[in-house]
Each structure stands twice: as C-alpha cells, then as structure tokens.
Amino acid sequence: MRTGVFLFGGVEMDDAGPGPPASTDRRSTSEEAWEATERVIDMAVVCDDLGYDSYWLAEHHFQHEGYEVVPNGILLGAVIAERTQRIRIGMAFNIVPQWHPLRLAEDFATLHNLSGGRGILGVGRGTVPRESETLGTRIGSFDNPDKAVADESNRRQFDEAMDVIQLALTEERFAYHGEVYDLPPPGIPDRGGTVQELTLVPRPLHPFETWQAITSPPTLEQVPRRGWGGVFWNNHPTFTKRNWDRFAEVFEEAHGRTLEPGEKRTLVRCVCVADTREEAMAKVRPGHDEMWKFLGPYGWSKGYMGPDGKPAKAGLIPSLEESLEQKIWIVGSADEVGEQIQWYRDLLGVEDLLLFPMMPGDSYKAGEEQVHRLAADVLPKFD
C-alpha cells in the first residue's frame, strides 16, 4: 500500500475550536504565514526520511485567516524536491481554471524533471469564490448565489484547460481550438508566416500520474473516462463504496479493462493516533472543530450521511463524535487506527492511502509527532 501525507499548510493557532473567533474574523500575519511555509517544507523532509510515498499540498489564495497559506505548491515542490531523495510530490489540488493551462503545464513539467520524475499532477476546479473570481474564473460554491451558472462555466473552462494541458505535456507539437481556449491564437506573425502550432518547453522526461478529487456526479463520470486517478475524501463509507465501484465501472466502459480493487483510486482520511482513544480524541477535537467551522459553510460536509440515509444538507457542522461514528475520521490508539485502515482496505481494496494528520491550528511539532507515530506504530501493520 502506498501511503502519503497531505497538509493544508496553515498557521498555528492557540485558540482553535468551535468557539470564537469566527473563521471570518481571523487574520494571520505575514510572519506567521511564512513560518508555516517553512515548516511545510521541513515536514516534507521528515516524511521523506520516514519512508512515506508521497507528500501533497493544497493551492489557495488570499487566505488571510491562515488556514491554507501556500498559493503555489508546484513552486514550493521544487524546493522540496531539492531537499528530499525519494518522496513523490503532489498537489491536492492545482486549481486549473485559476491558471493559464500552458503555464501550469510548463511549471509541472519543470517540477517533474527537477525531481527526477517525482511530480504528481493533482487537478481540481476550486471551491472558494474569493479565489476563483479574483483570479478570473468562477466557481459554484455552496454560498455562491449563481451557483449553477458559475459551476457550468467553471466546468467548461476546466475541461478545455485539461485538454490543453494533456496535449502540451504529451505531444511534441500541438494546437487546440475550443470555445474557451484558442491556442495558438490565429494570425500570430512569425518570420514571414503565422504560428500554426506550439511546443511545450520543457516537456516531462518521465511518466506522470494525474489525479482529481471526486466531488460530484459529473466528476465521477469524467475522471475515469479520462483515465486519471480519483481521490475520495470526506464521504460516509456507504457513499464512498458506491462511488468507488462506479468509478471502476466507468473506467471499464471507457477503456475496456477491469481495474484491480484499489487501482487508480486514493482514499484520504483525517487521522490522529495517541496512546488511547480518549487521548487521541482530546488531541484532535480542537482542530476538528476549527476545520468544520471553516469548511462547513463552503458545503464540504455534504458527504456525511443525514438521518434519512441520504447526504447531509450542505452547511452541516459535524461534531467529532459524528465524524467518528460515520467513519469519516480515524482516531484512536495505534491498534485502533490500524484496524480502521484495515476496515477500509477490506471494504474498498485500498492501495493508495493519503493521511491528513495535522488539523487547522495544530502546531507543526504536533504534526511531526503524528507522522512519526503513524510511521512507527501503524503503517508497519501493512508491510
């Protein structure tokens, strides 16, 4: 089983929890944000030394609250590549509509080559209107009043951008003429003629994987048809199992090949390990509650199960007890955490596991303790 670590990359908070301050009232300093950035790099080195397979960062912008302060994981990934030996470096996720697709392709190819083929192309459509609309696109967020129109526009832009990125990364010469992107634009003069095609420089020297989060029915159909890997997070196991199996069905329909039970699918789980379940719950509760105080209003808890057995209503702020009861978070002693991971392996055939061991507000010292304990006390159970 390949096991990676995923961090938001936020500032430390000594008042994390369900109470005040409200998420919208938080303001981190530039010094705090930069300290977090340096510690994110340090943590990558620790994870490399401990033998984790991969290390994933988020892309977010204008987050004065301090929850996610890394705007360009590829740029940071280049530094990580220089300081590590073997760990793969992924983005969860590059928000594709916020980039020009050719700049994203160039930057990823540069990281991939610099690292000797350790880059992972993680792509997404975004979740936060503050970021998307400021950077020239739209997103159908839960709190966006024109959600449907914005989502349709975003999806169309994402689809074309990914067409461009895949062409640029895999073909020596390419051109693309769609509704959103027209590349190269017609009529560009070049030494007596006009530009008819482009070549990405550099292009990847090594094979690479592409992964996208599975967050909606259209995405569940699109990702396997494209042949990419799907990332599953923050869903009740009933919903995860249904989508996990549907992913394999769509892949087989599109490509004529049956996937192995865990192939091309990654499970993400928030995790906390301690000597006892009670101690682990006490450790993780402030960060759990801060996380949902922050993300609940964006609709991130829609993967929880409501009392009617259907997805919970958007805007739910779950308690830690609900997260544990629904098996969406994995918290306990090393044996209990191992048992819960094995439960998912039995249910889904998981072969790619991404652990989220550091909650919003947690200290990096606590995060480092978690990755050490998981590597020493939990992961050897799956050797």
At which residue positions do the language-model features occur?
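N-terminal beta1-alpha1-beta2 module of alpha/beta enzyme domains
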Residues: M1-I87, F208
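An alpha-helical appendage that flanks or caps ligand/catalytic pockets
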Residues: V5-D25, F142-L200, F239-V350
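Hydrophobic faces of well-ordered beta-strands that scaffold small-molecule active sites
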Residues: T3-L7, Y55-L57, R88-M91, G119-V123, ...
